[in-house]
Amino acid sequence: MSNLGFKKGDKVVIVGGGFAGLQLARTLIKADLKVILVDKQNHHQFQPLFYQIASGRLEPSSISFPFRKIFQRSKSVDFRMADITNILPDERKIMTAYDRTINYDHLIIATGCRTNFFGNKELSENCFSMKTTQESIDIRNKILFSFEKEIFARPEEKQAWMNIVIVGGGPTGVELSGAFAELKKDVLPKDYHNIDFSKFNIILCEGSKNTLNNMSEESKVSSRKYLEDMSVIVKTETILVSYDGNEAVLNNGEHIPTKNVIWAAGVTGNIIKGLADDDVIRNRYIVDRLNRLKRFDNIYALGDVAYMETPLYPNGHPQVANVAINQAKNLGKNILKSLKDDKSEAIDYEYHDLGMMATIGKHKAVVELPFIKLKGAIAWYIWMFLHLMLILSVRNKLVIFFNWAWSYLTKDTSLRIITNIDYKKEKVISLK
């Protein structure tokens, strides 16, 4: 189909300001459309660096970009801060959490993923997840505050504050484990002279046989070796069965006393109520090669929340940033073609895998590009360069580069700030 039905002056509502939603809004910034970008947060969050917020490497503002700042010079793109709770397709409206509606001519759903605890309520209530900037800050606060609590804890309680369990051996879990390991080695002993950090255990649990299980065998082996060289305890073929806030129970019967469990073991599509069950598979909207929902001619889904079958990917695309960004670019091109009444065929989306990468620590990284596989220092520099280039503003690029350079030269960071502690709730400084 050559024309998607977009007309000049149409109201296009994009729900979600992640990689896909933001990319589409920027693609349409000069189009003759009325574009409304809606998100629960007032800022775009650069998720690949959440772990550096959690480990005190970067300040939150360096990876957070206010939407109104991004589009302050645009006359066609506006922003609304709202949590969308329902889609009313027959009325062409979406409902917000405070019972207000937003009308649309065309709806693009780019709501990304949420943490998947696989229905385990106990884990969802007691584990930390890391899907927002605020959750990353919460992890930083809790981990740093644990050492303050350890000082006042009874002897039999101390080890629980010194064990961190990270569940999930994908890039997030591996990178977070490595970041905490560097803190353990280079930073924390200088801050806490009366704590024996040889008892500080970083325990990474992965359900499959390997860390970075979606990468090559060489990267799997290298990532585990890097982690174990940094004194991370790696437990593969290990599943967290239960966690009550005090003790983690593993599927091998092991019981680990811990006050800190971070869940990085899975995500699921963040769908919105209102569409039929037939429109969804595994919490992702079923779309055609143009990212359009099959039962609608004016509703689209992008990125992690879109399920598109292609000959190369019969089970849908991986839920990674590259897919989200390029689906948004492709849809943007097709929308612009439609506005010009271009009679040529709309462009089907085709995913081109650009590779995977993960960093474990200083000079310890693995990079897999379509034409080469790398590890060690050169991979680490490539990882830093590529992530730095993805940061939106020049100012933030400079801030992040300065922080990385300072950390590289001094093996230290000045961002170990604990905020928003409720002393009554925590019952922290008790000498009883």
Regions found by a protein language model. Name each.
Residues 125-157, 246-247, 255-326:
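FAD-site-proximal beta/loop scaffold in flavoenzymes
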Residues 1-11, 77-165, 262:
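FAD-binding core/adjacent interface of flavoenzyme oxidoreductases
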